[in-house]
Amino acid sequence: MAISLHAVTPEFVAEVGDIDLGKPISASDLAAIKAAFTRYAVLIFPDQTFSDESHLDFARHFGPLETSVFKLRTDHKMRLDEKMADVGNLDANNNILAANDRVRLYQLGNRLWHTDSSFKRLPAYCSILHGRAIPPIGGHTEFADLRAAYDALPEDTKRRIAGLVAEHSLMTSRARLGFTDFDETERKAFEPVPQVLARRLPDSGRMSLYLASHAGTIRGMAKADAERLLKELTDHATQRQFVHAHRWRVNDLVMWDDRCTMHRGMDFDDQRYKRDMRRATVSDVAPTCEQMGMAVAAE
């Protein structure tokens, strides 16, 4: 039986049915998933009860996997495989993280609008998130369509941002919430990297904004002007008409295209309810500036 596809929104989010991702995927089903992903950018696969190993195997169909940033900390006991980002609120013993736990405070940055791994010179192509335990109230994820947001920009704004390069750092987004607890290894790993503000997607040919709370400066622009422009673009891109809220069900698997979306996790009572979320992240094929044919020196 071929997979089924149900559009949740006309051109942004779709639900994929009649497939068990814990089993080998046929070439025709994989091709259909990839075609749907190019069109929609966010795909929802309900009722996926597979193992972490099957999760990672599915993700590898889309490219090489990233390693969790928590691997940088020798004092951090990882709960999951190093290729799996642990973005819930549980410690290594599956207990709820204390309110003052470093990992919890770090994870609060995920409630800002962001794009996964835009703080890496080679950023993410896509993220594939599995919901193992879901709070009964809150904790949904909002997604913003940066392709549609780009299309809706005034033409003079499109011309204004063409060729502009922002500097992204994980420390920038965390500092917005007052989190600065990084060791020297992390500070070196999270030095700012250049990313274009607008990019063309090679598979569809569409233009998209490329934004995240990790971005704090724009090359060749005063800090205040850069922050104002980044806020203006983010406010534009997160208007209701560009945003879809996914309300999680246990064992939902959601994958999204990090090249042309932003997302944020919404509040929930993280001292009362467990939220076990496991993400595989696939690397992009090249740095964004390189993909846009721009030679950008390190600063």
Where are these regions (language model features)?
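Fe(II)/2-oxoglutarate oxygenase catalytic core
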Residues: 3-255, 259-299
